[in-house]
Amino acid sequence: MGFKGCGILLTENCNARCKMCCDSRGLVRGKTLTIEELDLILKNIKECPSIDLIGVTGGEPMLYPDLVEHIINFDYGRKVGITIKTNGFWGKDINKARNFIERNKSKIKMISFSYDQFHKEFIDLQNILNIVDI
């Protein structure tokens, strides 16, 4: 029996500066997967037929929505669900957030938000609520 799921750390970059986070050094300083690196990973996932769930994390993966959508829309040859771990900053622009969700809602299985007592100083709760309300 193979693995049922896997995670892709898309980027080390993040727009929040949460003090407790290992990625708190600032926005432009970390590695982001190139499209070539990402395709190599996705092709390997395609060769692993037991994987039916991919978690996309970072840093903040939604700094790179085109790469996130590349993961979502890759041809795995089977149904693969996607989860996204985000701070929700992209909910500030409700129209862009709505368009992203509408384009991808059939494949996104879960969006989890980084928000708690440690994050709230750096993350606007309203942005998260905007996404949840879509």
Stretches found by the model and what they are:
Residues 11, 61-64, 68:
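Generic structural signal for well-ordered secondary structure
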Residues 38, 67-68, 97, 128:
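Aromatic/hydrophobic pocket-lining residues that form the small-molecule binding cavity
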Residues 25-33, 50-64, 79-93, 105-128:
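Core AdoMet radical
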